[in-house]
């Protein structure tokens, strides 16, 4: 048996691979365990052994010819009976009469398949128009060789992915590229040259005669080729090993390149956005993740083996990984928070800023006009107007079902549940929530990196930072007052690290590098912001900001990943106290997302005294914001200097200096947030009224229909 017989043919691309290969060298397909007879029968006395009908793996071949179908003993003066064979209409392969499918391409046998006419003993198998050729050692081998050469010669290569397609294919079966208009059907000379240098014909010791190497068409198919002289078995093995070593690596690289090109050609825009998002998680590019989310991409999508191959970074990407897995693996807490933020899609959100676009644009212009830069050594931006947003008290006059619909469309139910039920962070005091009417509601906003800026404007003006006016002021203030904020930030970070037992010192270059990163976040629309930016926003608002947030980052499995460090009080410490307002705003923080916490208007104070003399009129709404957590521990004051840090009593004294504080009858230290509808901005009041009119109309419809029914009953 020759070395050629050891090769196995790929069932996908018909490439003949070396026996040691477990995958196809061309298309990387797995080796099939139940091979179809694709090689010509070999001239050997062992062919009479019936055991050859079974492969080494024990699987039975599809066709096992015996002595009754075709005599396996070759007689010099006797030719096989080929008249009973039928030719496949797809690949022209000559199959045995008992086969119901083609051995090569598995095509169904047609009724009345064309059979070859019997040959006279003096004729040799050849087509018309070709000169006679010497009789081969085995006529069946001759026909099988011709069929393979015909099949290869008639294929046309795809100009996009180089895959060789069948001649009847009008488009490439791999990349769907159209067939070139001038594709040659039978490249005669190429097939002859390829057959002469084909690696599948290495050393044929048993073929001593000259045989035909023609293609599938007529013409000059009778060109002769003389085989190389026979060599010993050891030399043949050495030659095969050298060929597989030298050519195999090049073939594998070429096959990998072709496979990669095929995968790229099949990919769509959504696939590229997903791969960019995966790379963005690894490299820390949040914009790529946001681009994938905004396009409607599935966050739970998993990487496939082909996509991992395109990314070409096995140390970072594995098949089956999602964006959440990558964010956990590379500790991207900000991205993890964005990815895990679940926004309910069951109800369409309907907030005042979306219902009244004309009024909203006017309010945005008012916001831009209210921002000014102070002259002097500290050129920070600041607001000239004190505006506080509250939900109207008329909501309580609506029917319960309309109220439920309103809250579903204006509140973030997931944030409200996490801050109230999963962790007692807000509304934990029955005294504040019920008797003092200081229940806080989490407004819904965008889930992108602008959620901090959106929540600040929602808590004051009731709108989004759509035009990035507040972000621009934040960026300019950070750069213009960089020295002031940098000193506070550096001193605070050093103290905070030491408070957790982390005694280390950084070089000034490292501090500057971290500070440059904080500055860059402020200038990038959509980038998530940090504690320093909340501190700067307190100066722009000229009022304190109280953040009620979760204490720990948690994975989607509920595992604690680290401290959030956002909860606490942010005071405008770099301004003079006389230049600032004492009425704070409240924000909620959950898993990398900020939400505005607002109260509902109340009808005056009545007997709601909280241990303080409230000499105000009935039009003013006072919301009592707790300055302690549910465990009655004082909230931290962020970015204090070394001189300002002291005991808890000293920090409480500082809170009383910057805010109007009092202690309730239950002993809770609270800060008073004051707002007045009469003193509020008229555009904000008009926007809220127009938004509320839509729910009033919903409440009026059932009443109207009930009244009509009553009138009809009276008429009867």
Curated annotation (Swiss-Prot):
- What subcellular compartments does it reside in? Cytoplasm; Nucleus
Record-level GO BP terms = brain development; cell migration; central nervous system morphogenesis; cytoskeleton organization; positive regulation of Wnt signaling pathway; protein deubiquitination involved in ubiquitin-dependent protein catabolic process; protein K29-linked deubiquitination; protein K33-linked deubiquitination
List the PROSITE patterns hit by this protein, alphabetically.
OTU, ZF_RANBP2_1, ZF_RANBP2_2
What Enzyme Commission number(s) does the record list for this chain? 3.4.19.12
On the tree of life, the source organism's domain of life is Eukaryota
Q: Which InterPro entries match?
A: AnkUBD, OTU_Deubiquitinase, OTU_dom, Znf_RanBP2, Znf_RanBP2_sf, ZRANB1_OTU
| Zinc finger map (RanBP2-type) | 3-33, 82-111, 152-181
Region annotation (Disordered) ranges: 113-143, 178-228
Protein's UniProt keywords contain Protease: yes
Active-site residues per Swiss-Prot or TrEMBL entry: 451, 593
Q: Which reaction does this chain catalyze?
A: Thiol-dependent hydrolysis of ester, thioester, amide, peptide and isopeptide bonds formed by the C-terminal Gly of ubiquitin (a 76-residue protein attached to proteins as an intracellular targeting signal)
Which keywords does this Swiss-Prot/TrEMBL entry list?
ANK repeat, Cytoplasm, Hydrolase, Metal-binding, Nucleus, Protease, Repeat, Thiol protease, Ubl conjugation pathway, Wnt signaling pathway, Zinc, Zinc-finger
Q: Which residues bind Zn(2+) 3?
A: 158, 161, 172, 175
Where would I find the OTU domain in this sequence? 440-600
Q: What is its main location?
A: cytoplasm
Q: Where are the ANK repeats?
A: 268-298, 321-348
Q: Which residues bind Zn(2+) 2?
A: 88, 91, 102, 105
Which portions of the chain have biased composition (kind: Polar residues)? 118-136, 183-203
Q: Enzyme group, top EC level?
A: hydrolase
Report residues binding Zn(2+) 1. 10, 13, 24, 27
- To which protein family does this belong? Belongs to the peptidase C64 family.
Q: Know anything about its domains from the record?
A: The RanBP2-type zinc fingers, also called NZFs, mediate the interaction with ubiquitin and determine linkage specificity. RanBP2-type zinc fingers 1 and 2 (also named NZF1 and NZF2) specifically recognize and bind 'Lys-29'- and 'Lys-33'-linked ubiquitin. RanBP2-type zinc finger 3 (also named NZF3) binds 'Lys-33'-linked ubiquitin and shows weak binding to 'Lys-6'-, 'Lys-48'- and 'Lys-63'-linked ubiquitin chains but it does not interact with 'Lys-29'-linked chains. The OTU domain mediates the deubiquitinating activity.
Q: What is this protein called?
A: Ubiquitin thioesterase zranb1-B
Gene encoding the protein = zranb1b
């Amino acid at each position: 048996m020759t070395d050629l017989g050891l090769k196995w043919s790929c069932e996908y691309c018909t490439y003949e691979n070396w026996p040691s290969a477990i995958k196809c060298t061309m298309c990387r397909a797995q080796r099939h365990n139940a091979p179809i007879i694709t090689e010509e029968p070999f001239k050997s006395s062992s062919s009479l052994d019936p055991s050859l009908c079974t492969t080494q793996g024990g699987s039975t071949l599809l066709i096992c010819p015996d002595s009754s179908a075709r005599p396996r003993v070759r007689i010099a003066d006797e030719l096989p009976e080929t008249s009973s064979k039928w030719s496949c209409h797809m690949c022209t392969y000559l199959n045995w009469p008992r086969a119901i499918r083609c051995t090569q391409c598995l095509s169904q046998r047609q009724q009345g398949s064309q059979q070859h006419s019997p040959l006279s003993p003096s004729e040799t198998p050849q087509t018309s128009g070709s000169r006679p050729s010497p009789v081969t050692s085995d006529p069946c081998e001759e026909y099988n060789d011709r069929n393979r050469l015909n099949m290869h010669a008639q294929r046309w290569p795809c100009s996009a992915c180089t895959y060789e397609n069948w001649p009847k294919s009008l488009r490439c079966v791999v990349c769907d590229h159209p067939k070139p208009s001038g594709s040659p059907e039978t490249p005669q000379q190429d097939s002859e040259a390829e057959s002469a240098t084909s690696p599948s014909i290495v050393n044929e010791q048993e073929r001593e005669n000259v045989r035909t190497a023609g293609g599938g068409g007529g013409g000059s198919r009778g060109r002769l080729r003389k085989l190389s002289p026979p060599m010993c078995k050891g030399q043949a093995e050495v030659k095969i090993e050298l060929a597989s070593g030298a050519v195999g690596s090049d073939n594998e690289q070429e096959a990998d390149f072709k496979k990669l090109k095929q995968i790229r050609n099949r990919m769509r825009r959504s696939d590229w956005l997903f791969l960019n998002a995966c790379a963005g998680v690894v490299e820390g590019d949040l914009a790529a993740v946001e681009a994938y989310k905004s396009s409607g991409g599935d966050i739970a999508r998993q990487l496939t083996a082909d996509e991992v191959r395109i990314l070409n970074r096995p140390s970072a990407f594995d098949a089956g990984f999602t964006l959440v897995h990558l964010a956990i693996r590379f500790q991207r807490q900000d991205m993890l928070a964005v990815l895990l933020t679940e926004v309910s899609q069951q109800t369409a959100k309907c907030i005042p800023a979306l219902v009244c676009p004309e009024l909203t644009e006017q309010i945005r212009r008012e916001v831009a006009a209210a921002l000014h830069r102070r002259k002097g050594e500290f050129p920070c931006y600041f607001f000239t107007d004190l505006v506080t947003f509250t939900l109207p008290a008329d909501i309580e006059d609506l029917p319960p079902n309309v109220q439920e619909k309103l809250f579903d469309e204006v509140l973030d139910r997931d944030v409200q549940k996490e801050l109230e039920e999963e962790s007692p962070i807000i509304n934990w005091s029955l005294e504040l929530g019920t008797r003092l009417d200081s229940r806080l509601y989490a407004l819904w906003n965008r889930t992108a990196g602008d959620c901090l800026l959106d929540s600040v404007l929602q808590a004051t003006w009731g709108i989004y930072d759509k035009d990035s006016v507040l972000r621009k002021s934040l960026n300019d203030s950070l750069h213009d007052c960089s020295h002031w904020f940098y000193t506070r930030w550096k001193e605070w970070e050093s103290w905070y690290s030491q408070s957790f037992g982390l005694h280390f010192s950084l070089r000034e270059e490292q501090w500057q590098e971290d500070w440059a990163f904080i500055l860059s976040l402020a200038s990038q629309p959509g980038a998530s912001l940090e504690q320093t930016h909340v501190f700067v926003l307190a100066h722009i608002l000229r009022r304190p900001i109280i953040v009620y947030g979760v204490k720990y980052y948690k994975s989607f499995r509920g595992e604690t990943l680290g401290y959030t460090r956002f909860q606490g009080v942010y005071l405008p410490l770099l301004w003079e106290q006389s230049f600032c307002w004492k009425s704070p705003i409240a924000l909620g923080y959950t898993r990398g997302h900020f939400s505005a916490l607002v109260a509902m208007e109340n009808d005056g104070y009545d007997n709601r005294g909280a241990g303080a003399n409230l000499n105000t009129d009935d039009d003013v709404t006072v919301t009592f914001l707790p300055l302690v957590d549910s465990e009655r521990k004082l909230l931290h004051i962020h970015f204090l200097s070394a001189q300002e840090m002291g005991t808890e009593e000293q920090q409480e004294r500082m809170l009383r200096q910057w805010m109007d504080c009092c202690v309730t009858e239950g002993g809770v230290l609270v800060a008073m947030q004051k707002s007045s509808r009469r003193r509020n901005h008229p555009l904000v009041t008009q926007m809220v009224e127009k938004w509320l009119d839509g729910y009033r109309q919903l409440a009026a419809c059932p009443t109207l229909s009930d009244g009509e029914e009553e009138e009809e009953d009276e008429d009867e």
